[in-house]
Structure formats: structure tokens, C-alpha cells
């Protein structure tokens, strides 16, 4: 008797259909959220090619000697790569320190020329009793973690 009554009872028929509909809508919403999430960021690699201080010759690497205490114009050439050693285009590079600053954007080959001094930035000041100045390099690009090196370039003061 109860089995027949249970078979004819249609009051709870909507419950499984509602659950199926909610499950489908939830899956569609989850798929949409996963499609919106951007791919993970990558690390940048930065090479400092050379450093030039005022009228002195260009020095390969990240260390240069400075003669005497004064304001100096500094030019630094860098190259920016991704994790596969491909050049990164349109990365913003900033070099600061010693009261000077310089900015540039990388070109198609990943090169940037940072000039501290003159019209595009202020000069680096080295005081009489100061032995060295460290310049901070920050590189930012879309889709990459920011690269930051507090001691990217070292300028060492010499007497002559």
C-alpha cells in the first residue's frame, strides 16, 4: 500500500531537477572564472652590458671608477630577457641612486639605455668622503614579476 502511494506521489519530483540545473549553472560559472584568470607571471633576467661615467671610457660590467668628488653623468646599457632568453620588448627600466635617476623602455632586442644626467635625468653626486655609490635598478613589464636590484651598478671613487 505504501509503495503504491510513494510511486504516485509527485511532490518531490522538482528537487532533483533543481539540483541538476544548479549544478550545470555552477559548472558554467566556474568555467567562466577559470577562463578569466590570466596565466602565471614569469621572472625577468637583466644583464648590465656596460657603464660609462662622464667622459671616461665605457667599462663592461656593472662597476666603474669615478675620479674625484663631483656631479657625474652616468650611462648604463642593459638587456632584458624572459626565462627562455628571448628579449623582452617595452619593459620599463629605472635606475636611481646618488641623487640621480634615469628611465628608458626596452626596444625589440630588449636593450635599454639609461642616462643619469642632462635633460633626461639628474646627475649622480659623489661627495668628497664617499667611497662608493650604489645605483638601484627596477625593471617592470606586463606579464612578468618586477625585477629589482638594490646594488645593480657600483661607482667607486678614486683620487686620480
Where would I find each of the regions flagged by the language model?
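Edge beta-strands of extracellular beta-sandwich domains
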Residues: 142-158
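N-terminal leader/signal peptides at the extreme start of proteins
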Residues: 1-11
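Short amphipathic beta-strand segments in non-cytosolic proteins
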Residues: 71-73, 92-104
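Proline/serine/threonine-rich low-complexity linkers at boundaries of modular beta-sandwich domains
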Residues: 37-56
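Short, aromatic- and glycine-rich surface loops/edge beta-strands on solvent-exposed regions
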Residues: 122-145
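N-terminal single-pass transmembrane signal-anchor helix
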Residues: 9-36
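Glycine-centered loop-to-beta-strand initiation motif
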Residues: 104-122
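Beta-strand-rich structural segments
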Residues: 61-85
